[in-house]
């Protein structure tokens, strides 16, 4: 009596954590909302099978068709759903039946190698780092067919060695020569050679059913001989008879059982295996990269991420600007300030708490930013920015402060001017123009604010000082308490800070089609709850952007700065403002003289 041919499970999956990391990256950056099947590849190590069946390994390189050339490569695909509901509602029986039918058709058309393939269905919860997946390798046979073993025999080691060197898991023998198991050769071949996925004695892998179904439909014969090659001494050849109808409906199976031995999906929770800092990094990037899925596919997030921001003034504006930059994924933020945290600061300045009172502001702000996001590169510098019109009192210290400021501006990409005093902004404005940096200015009134980007040589737009006909001078001496403190409606700083950062982000984009056009100035008025966009040209006699001023600073450095601190009039003289003032005074005198002449003539 003949024995029915039995089969072992076709495979056992091993999904490395690197596969999920790569799937996450591709889903976020490449696939996005595209839920079409994507090709996978698995390198089968048929020479080192430690369990009863081959291990189907999936790693980060499984998305790359170029795998280890010495290994047998099996093709597959992954269908990653956009929602967990879609994953759960997928008809798994229908899915594998359709895949089995496709494999049969591919086998009949292209040969036995094309009738074996694996499939992964998955859902990646990118926020929780949890992955749901199910792997299958469809095996099929016609419903009315069965397979009987007529005889078996061992295979000589020499023959096995010659065949094993072939870099394919399936081939056939025609007139004593090994050939590809294509339909052309399957019609006339004497036997098929299969590098078996199973190590159970006398029991081949279930994909043998695929080979027999395809082969028996291509070539009608009484028996079919298959050589099952293995790396141990259990290789054997079997003569098999296919009985019953071989053209009816397909019976398809092949879903892998989970760890409990049930036909159900598996899951992998990587959150406990990951460094919390890495999780924070990826979570920040996740929220931003989701913008590219539908809303802003062309947004340049890398430029925002890699830009180096220098925040001059670590008060209310500075704190909110830093938080907004962090939310946009910026990784490099430097603070500069000359004061310490006062008891009134923590309620208005979100990077400080009560324990920070008395600490240098820049240092405390930097430390707080690193507590919020440990991967940020941040530093705090306590220094006084030399102010035009404020005479030099300690030259060695002020010169050192100038040199540090100059180096900071030179090594950063964008400079935020967020200081209280107008004259504090003059030197950074000149240095920013000299080093050709992006300069963003924000200033507050009681219920109004100004946000602007300084112009450059290309756009001919004005800077913060381009509307002035006098250079800034000492405005801090002899001021009352309400003039020394920033008296403003608390919400104004948030509005100005957020618009300053959004202005920068918009300006950094490659075109106006991404986030719109970047205005030159934004003026907000909270008493009317409105904003106005303005654009003003550069003023040739501006005390900060005038070419003579910039060239003099470039050539003379500290010596010119010292001169400007002691006497702001020298800047007016250099920029041409003095002449403008003289002409204006002369015009006024002429108007007065004209009015006097008219009065005399009337009398």
Curated annotation (Swiss-Prot):
Active site: 485 (glycyl thioester intermediate)
Keywords, comma-separated and alphabetical: Autophagy, Cytoplasm, Protein transport, Transport, Ubl conjugation pathway
A Pfam family it matches: ATG7_N
Gene3D superfamilies xrefs: NAD(P)-binding Rossmann-like Domain, Ubiquitin-like modifier-activating enzyme ATG7 C-terminal domain, Ubiquitin-like modifier-activating enzyme ATG7 N-terminal domain
UniProt short sequence motif GXGXXG motif, positions renumbered to this chain: 313-318
Cellular compartments annotated: Cytoplasm; Preautophagosomal structure
InterPro entries noted in UniProt: Atg7, Atg7_N, Atg7_N_1, Atg7_N_2, ThiF/MoeB/HesA, ThiF_NAD_FAD-bd, Ubiquitin-activating_enz
GO molecular function annotations of the record: Atg12 activating enzyme activity; Atg8 activating enzyme activity
GO biological process: autophagosome assembly; autophagy of mitochondrion; cellular response to nitrogen starvation; piecemeal microautophagy of the nucleus; protein modification by small protein conjugation; protein transport
Principal location class: cytoplasm
Superkingdom of source: Eukaryota
GO cellular component, one term: phagophore assembly site
PANTHER family associated with the record: UBIQUITIN-ACTIVATING ENZYME E1 (PTHR10953), UBIQUITIN-LIKE MODIFIER-ACTIVATING ENZYME ATG7 (PTHR10953:SF3)
Task of the protein: E1-like activating enzyme involved in the 2 ubiquitin-like systems required for cytoplasm to vacuole transport (Cvt) and autophagy. Activates ATG12 for its conjugation with ATG5 and ATG8 for its conjugation with phosphatidylethanolamine. Both systems are needed for the ATG8 association to Cvt vesicles and autophagosomes membranes. Autophagy is essential for maintenance of amino acid levels and protein synthesis under nitrogen starvation.
Subunit structure of this chain's protein: Homodimer.
Domain notes: The GxGxxG motif is important for the function, possibly through binding with ATP.
Entry's family note: Belongs to the ATG7 family.
Protein name (Swiss-Prot/TrEMBL): Ubiquitin-like modifier-activating enzyme ATG7
Species for this entry: Kluyveromyces lactis (strain ATCC 8585 / CBS 2359 / DSM 70799 / NBRC 1267 / NRRL Y-1140 / WM37)
Origin organism lineage: Eukaryota, Fungi, Dikarya, Ascomycota, Saccharomycotina
Underlying gene: ATG7
């Amino acid at each position: 009596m003949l024995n029915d041919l039995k089969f072992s499970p076709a495979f056992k999956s091993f999904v490395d954590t690197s596969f999920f990391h790569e799937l996450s990256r591709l889903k976020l950056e490449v696939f996005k909302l595209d839920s079409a099947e994507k090709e996978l590849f698995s390198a089968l190590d048929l020479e080192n099978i430690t369990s009863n069946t081959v291990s189907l390994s999936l790693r980060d390189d499984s998305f790359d068709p170029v795998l280890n050339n010495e290994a047998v490569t099996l093709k597959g695909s992954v269908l990653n759903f956009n929602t967990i509901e879609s994953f759960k509602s997928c008809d798994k029986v229908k899915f594998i039946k359709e895949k089995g039918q496709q494999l049969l058709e591919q086998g009949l058309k292209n040969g036995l190698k094309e009738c074996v393939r694996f499939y992964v269905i998955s859902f990646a919860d990118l926020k929780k780092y949890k992955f749901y997946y199910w792997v299958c390798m469809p095996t099929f046979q016609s419903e009315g067919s069965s397979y009987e073993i007529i005889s078996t025999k061992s295979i000589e080691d020499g023959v096995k060695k010659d065949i094993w060197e072939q870099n394919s898991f399936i081939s056939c023998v025609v007139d004593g020569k090994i050939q590809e198991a294509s339909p052309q050769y399957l019609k006339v071949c004497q036997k098929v050679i299969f590098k078996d996925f199973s190590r159970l004695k006398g029991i081949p892998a279930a994909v043998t059913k695929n080979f027999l179904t395809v082969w028996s439909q291509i070539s009608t014969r009484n028996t079919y001989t298959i050589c099952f090659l293995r790396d141990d001494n259990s290789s054997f050849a079997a003569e098999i008879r296919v009985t019953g109808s071989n053209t009816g409906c397909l019976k398809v199976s092949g879903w892998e059982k989970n760890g409990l031995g049930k036909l159900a999906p598996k899951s992998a929770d990587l959150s406990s295996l990951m460094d919390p800092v890495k999780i924070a990094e990826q979570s920040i990037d996740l929220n931003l990269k989701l913008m590219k899925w539908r809303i802003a596919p062309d947004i340049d997030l890398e430029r925002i991420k890699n830009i180096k921001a220098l925040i001059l003034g670590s008060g209310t504006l500075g704190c909110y600007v830093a938080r907004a930059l962090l939310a946009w994924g910026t990784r490099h933020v430097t603070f500069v300030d000359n004061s310490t945290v006062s008891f009134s600061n923590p309620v208005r300045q979100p990077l400080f708490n009560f324990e920070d009172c008395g600490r240098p502001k820049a240092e405390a702000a930097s430390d707080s930013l690193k507590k919020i996001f440990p991967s940020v590169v941040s530093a705090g510098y306590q220094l006084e920015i030399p102010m035009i019109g404020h005479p030099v009192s300690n030259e060695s210290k002020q010169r050192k402060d100038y040199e540090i400021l100059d180096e900071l501006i030179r090594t950063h990409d964008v400079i935020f001017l967020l200081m209280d005093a107008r004259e504090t902004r003059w030197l950074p404005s000149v240095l920013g123009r000299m080093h050709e940096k992006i300069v963003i200015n924000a200033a507050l009134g009681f219920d109004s604010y100004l946000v602007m980007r300084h112009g450059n040589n290309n756009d001919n737009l004005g800077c913060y000082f381009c509307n002035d006909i006098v250079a800034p001078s000492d405005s801090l001496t002899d001021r009352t308490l309400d003039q020394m403190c920033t008296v403003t409606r608390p919400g104004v700083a948030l509005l100005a800070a957020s618009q300053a950062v959004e202005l920068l982000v918009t300006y950094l984009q490659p075109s106006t089609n991404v986030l719109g056009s970047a205005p030159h100035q934004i003026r907000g008025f909270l008493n009317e709850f409105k904003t106005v966009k303005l654009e003003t040209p550069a003023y040739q006699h501006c005390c900060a952007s005038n070419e003579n001023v910039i060239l003099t600073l470039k050539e003379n450095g500290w010596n010119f700065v010292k001169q400007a601190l002691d006497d702001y009039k020298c800047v007016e003289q250099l920029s041409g403002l003095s002449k403008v003032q003289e002409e204006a005074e002369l015009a006024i005198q002429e108007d007065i003289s004209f009015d006097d002449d008219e009065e005399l003539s009337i009398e």
